[in-house]
A protein has these predicted regions:
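Functional beta-strand-loop-alpha-helix junction segments that form "active/interaction loops"
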Residues: 2-13, 93-94, 179-262
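Short beta-strand segments
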Residues: 29-31, 52, 122-124, 172-173, ...
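Catalytic-core domains of enzymes
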Residues: 54-61, 73-76, 114, 122-223, ...
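Catalytic cores of nucleophile-dependent amide-cleaving enzymes
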Residues: 152-155, 160, 222-317, 322
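Short, charged, surface-exposed loops that flank catalytic or proteolytic processing sites
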Residues: 115-117, 320-330
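Second-shell loop/turn segments in exported
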Residues: 87-93, 176-183, 276-277
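Domain-scale, conserved, charged regions that form catalytic cores
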Residues: 1-145, 157, 166
Length: 330
């Protein structure tokens, strides 16, 4: 699908706000642009930030960066988060502060002036796996200030407000595997989701590749929740797999849902397996990105390994609030 124009984006943002699907929304595009003339040891790229809101003129900012230094900051922040270390945001040299200075600070004053509260961040390769919520200016975290969602491409994301639809849900997952660590709390997670949101449950042997694809293609369902292991391998979706209760399935199979759900895309696909948001260099958003390629309006994945107990409690609360009218970004 083609990328929407600025005028189309502004019209869509106005519709979203008018129909109260999001509060004061805007699109923030972030991408790298290579410098034509390089100096060894210095900046080798521009970080281009473009802010598009419904009523205001388009705003653009450009920051000089070194790609290797940026990647090192991102890796350091991942390490702190995965080890549950303090982010030390009081220190301007901390990764969370430095990344905020590059990605958010150039447009922060504009966001405040325009009263923006909700952002759709369209992130270029190398930026899709940034944990934006953890970035800080030293006084507060980005995730506390803004409701936001992330997309690898505006062309992949259905932006027009969705019509009211059934909230029928699939809850699928596996707790035991051949050659992989068990996920003992997956049954509890799915059962709690089933009881709180009247989902149809498929666990272990009942969770097969065929069942996943056939049920997800059924337009009676608008949400799919999958709790299992996923493996991202070099070579893209065809080589990467999702582990069902009867064995692995190629992630490339999932992309066919775009064709099958063309008239009524899935509203939400959740993948609460280990690190389902991250892929390889060719597909940073991993299975969550693939869910968007499959035509889902939204997808949720995890940036790092998560505790089963916390995951279960989070998603029960998440679906409860979603059913009460809270937006996914909030």
């Amino acid at each position: 699908p083609p990328t929407p124009t600025v005028e189309e984006l502004q019209t869509l943002l106005e519709q979203v706000e008018t129909r109260r699907f999001a509060s004061s929304p805007a699109v923030l595009q972030v991408r790298f642009t290579e410098m034509r003339q390089l100096q060894p040891g210095f900046h080798d790229a521009f970080l281009d930030l473009t802010l598009i809101s419904a009523q205001s003129p388009v705003q653009a900012k450009r920051v000089e960066v070194n790609r290797n230094s940026f990647a090192a900051l991102l890796k350091a922040l991942y390490r702190q988060l995965s080890r549950q270390e303090a982010l030390a945001v009081h220190d301007p040299a901390s990764p969370a502060r430095q990344l905020h200075a590059l990605l958010i600070a150039p447009v922060q004053e504009i966001l405040q002036e325009q009263g923006i509260e909700t952002l759709l961040i369209a992130a270029d390769q190398g930026l899709q796996a940034v944990p934006f919520a953890a970035l800080s200016d030293g006084t507060d975290y980005f995730g506390n200030r803004y409701a936001f969602a992330l997309t690898p491409s505006l062309a992949l994301t259905p932006l027009a407000p969705a019509e009211s639809r059934s909230q029928n849900q699939l809850a699928m997952g596996a707790s035991t595997f051949d050659g992989l660590a068990p996920l003992p709390l997956v049954p509890q997670e799915l059962e709690r989701i089933e009881s709180s949101s009247a989902a149809d449950l498929y666990l272990n042997q009942a969770f097969t590749p065929t069942v996943l694809l056939e049920r997800a293609a059924d337009q009676r369902y608008s949400r799919v929740h999958v709790a299992t292991h996923a493996d991202f391998r070099p070579g893209g979706p065809a080589e990467s797999v999702l582990h069902t209760g009867t064995g692995p399935m190629s992630m490339a199979q999932f992309a066919d849902l775009r064709r099958q759900r063309r008239d009524q895309p899935l509203d939400l696909v959740v993948l609460s397996a280990c690190r389902t948001l991250l892929g390889d260099a060719d597909s940073e958003l991993g299975f969550a990105g693939l869910a968007l390629q499959a035509g889902a309006r939204s997808a949720i994945g995890t940036l790092w390994y998560v505790d089963d107990v916390v995951t279960s409690a989070f998603f029960v609360q998440f679906y409860r609030l979603l059913d009460q009218g809270l937006s996914k970004a909030q």
